[in-house]
A protein has these predicted regions:
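Hydrophobic alpha-helical transmembrane segments of multi-pass integral membrane proteins
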Residues: 1-468
Length: 468
């Protein structure tokens, strides 16, 4: 098993090209490609697979729109499509980002790139088989898929854990990754129980309880905790917001971690009033954690040096609003009980689709174009005309996809809460259209090889400038 060289404890001197005034963004984000980061193939294959799952998930929303409008969240079709977003899009993107950002955020390289590729080769097809197996009620595909997912997750957790052992300065980002990986492991165990229950039914009346616990551990303990930790480094980097008060990140992580554990205990215990009280305490802590994260993000945005937000940061900011909306709905969901299925579905839809997915799309718009620029144009600086990072995609198209995705997410929530199937399906089509534009943007970034390629597909300079 090959091991990547360790990252020097002293920050490397910026390369000569970073002093050139041609493209300011590579300077601001040069840390994303510092010494010790893996070859771009490792994060690249994860990002490419994540996009495919995002496409599949967005098309699946159109398919399951009537079931969503009816609040049928226990439907195997809904479960299959949901896993395209949770495992395929969110988790796959986080895996790829972790490999690239460990040297940046913690000063250590990934323990083994080869193990990273092994993890990907098991996890990606595993998610595809599992999601399709759940949606089609195929026990064989589910079993094969979950076995491959187990291999992929195990390889990743061990690989990252061996990397985390080398970290000298164990700050909030280190803590966030440790907490998130712990919840990822718990998420997988509970998911395996639910998958087994589909065939055997051994959970009986516990199925909905275990499902609710599984969902909250996955979305809050794994995805949101990781987002809080990574954003602690990425948002100041992207916003040029150094000097902001950063104490709210640790408060968010502590509240979220404790809240998810207590909420899970409250959900799975059956001691009447005591169980309900524990659940409410867990929810209160989670709400505090979300508020702390929103405050921290707001402080970063307020301290930014660039007054105008680019498309990626506007996607992320919009995602934060949806996260806040979902959090505001949570107490009503808990108070209403499991009988209000459409309210439950709306709550998850706002948080998963409008919140987490849109926020990660915003980070995608920041990370992938920069990595593509480094791979294609770094060595051509000063030799010929090269595009800036911002010119790798169209800001006009990016804002259109944001409008479509946000309007579609809001429309789907309205369609579900009112039970109007047609509205839910039309809104799902808007989401899918936004995803199609987003993927076309990333494809343009990936395929560009020269300034001419960028210019041929660009928008009018004056139009583009208004969105910069």
């Amino acid at each position: 098993m090959s091991t990547a060289p360790p990252v020097p404890s002293v920050a490397p001197r910026p390369p000569a090209w970073s002093a050139r005034p041609v493209s300011p963004r590579p300077v601001a984000m040069a840390g994303l490609a510092m010494e010790g980061t893996p070859s771009l193939r490792l994060p690249g294959e994860h990002f490419a697979a994540a996009l495919l799952f995002l496409i599949a998930g967005s098309l699946g929303l159109i398919w399951i729109a009537p079931e969503l409008a009816a609040g049928l969240y226990l439907s195997p079709h809904v479960a299959g499509v949901t896993h395209c977003f949770t495992l395929g899009w969110l988790s796959m993107t986080i895996f790829g980002a972790m490999y690239q950002l460990l040297p940046v955020a913690l000063g250590v390289s990934i323990h083994s790139e080869r193990a990273g590729h092994v993890s990907f080769c098991a996890f990606a097809p595993g998610v595809a088989l599992f999601a399709f197996g759940v949606a089609s009620s195929s026990e064989a595909l589910r079993n094969i898929g979950i076995t491959l997912i187990a291999i992929g997750v195990t390889c990743l957790v061990i690989n990252v854990a061996l990397s985390l052992r080398k970290v000298a300065d164990r700050d909030v980002i280190w803590g966030a990754i440790v907490i998130a990986l712990s919840f990822l492991t718990l998420t997988f165990v509970m998911g395996a129980l639910l998958a087994r229950n589909i065939h055997s039914g051994f959970l009986g009346g516990w199925r909905v309880t275990v499902l609710a616990t599984h969902l909250h551990v996955a979305l809050l303990g794994w995805v949101l905790v990781m987002i809080v930790g990574i954003s602690h480094r990425l948002l100041p980097m992207f916003l040029l917001a150094h000097g902001a008060d950063t104490r709210w990140t640790s408060r968010a992580l502590a509240s979220l971690a404790a809240g998810v554990v207590i909420l899970a205990i409250g959900l799975i215990t059956t001691h009447g009033a005591a169980s309900g009280m524990i659940t409410w305490v867990g929810l209160l802590l989670i709400e505090c954690g979300v508020v702390c994260f929103l405050i921290q993000a707001g402080l970063f945005f307020r301290a930014r040096k660039r007054p105008r937000l680019d498309a990626g940061l506007r996607h992320a900011a919009t995602g934060l609003f949806f996260i806040a909306a979902s959090a505001a709905l949570a107490p009503l969901v808990l108070a209403s009980g499991p009988e209000h299925r459409q309210l439950d579905t709306t709550y998850v839809l706002l948080g998963l689709l409008g919140g987490l997915t849109l926020y990660v799309i915003g980070q995608f718009y920041k990370i992938v174009p920069f990595l593509a620029w480094m791979a294609r144009f770094r060595n051509e600086m000063g030799k010929k005309r090269v595009p800036t990072v911002a010119q790798l995609y169209s800001p006009l198209v990016a804002h259109i996809d944001l409008a479509l995705f946000a309007a579609g997410s809001l429309g789907m929530a309205m369609g579900v809460i009112t039970g109007i199937s047609l509205l839910t399906r039309i809104a799902a089509m808007l989401v899918a259209s936004g995803v199609a534009l987003f993927v076309s943007q990333i494809a343009r970034v990936a395929l560009a090889t020269s300034f001419r390629d960028i210019g041929a597909a660009g928008v009018q300079p004056q139009i583009a400038k208004t969105f910069e």
